[in-house]
């Protein structure tokens, strides 16, 4: 018996016919979370956000997200408005492209 006989056969070029299911995080109303689209990057971890409630807010990327997640113009994010200044918000989640497609199909994103 050789070493080649002991190796498991690999299937490199076989496409999977199974659909992959991913859980998509939706905004939680009890935590005052809102969906928003990034309009522009302002620098110094700040951005201009167009929220789904119709308000344009200045967003802040907290330090816990700064290095891990890169946010660009046009990205869809979840924000939490500040309690004492409604025109400012913290970004807490960024969606990937397949997740944005799912949100559009389910009616979470308007227009």
Curated annotation (Swiss-Prot):
Which Gene Ontology terms describe the biological processes this protein takes part in?
Answer: translational initiation
Region Disordered: what ranges?
1-26
What residue stretches are annotated with the S1-like domain?
22-96
Q: Does the keyword Protein biosynthesis apply?
A: yes
Per the record, the domain of life is: Archaea
Please name the GO terms that the record assigns under molecular function: RNA binding; translation initiation factor activity
Give UniProt keywords alphabetically: Initiation factor, Protein biosynthesis
Which Gene Ontology CC terms are recorded? cytoplasm
Q: What InterPro entries would the database entry show? A: NA-bd_OB-fold (IPR012340), RNA-binding_domain_S1_IF1 (IPR006196), TIF_eIF-1A (IPR001253), TIF_eIF-1A_CS (IPR018104)
Give yes or no: UniProt keyword Protein biosynthesis.
yes
Q: What does this protein do?
A: Seems to be required for maximal rate of protein biosynthesis. Enhances ribosome dissociation into subunits and stabilizes the binding of the initiator Met-tRNA(I) to 40 S ribosomal subunits.
Membership in a protein family: Belongs to the eIF-1A family.
Name of this protein: Translation initiation factor 1A 1
Please state the gene responsible for encoding this protein.
Answer: eIF1A1
């Amino acid at each position: 018996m050789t070493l080649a006989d002991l190796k498991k056969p690999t299937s490199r070029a076989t496409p999977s016919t199974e659909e992959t299911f991913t859980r998509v995080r939706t905004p939680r109303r009890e935590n005052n979370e809102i969906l928003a689209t990034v309009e522009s990057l302002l620098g110094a971890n700040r951005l201009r956000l167009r929220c789904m409630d119709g308000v344009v807010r200045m967003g802040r990327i907290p330090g816990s997200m700064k290095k891990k997640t890169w946010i660009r113009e046009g990205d869809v994010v979840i924000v939490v408005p500040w309690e004492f200044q409604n025109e400012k918000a913290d970004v807490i989640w960024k969606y990937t492209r397949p997740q944005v497609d799912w949100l559009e199909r389910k009616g979470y994103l308007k227009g």
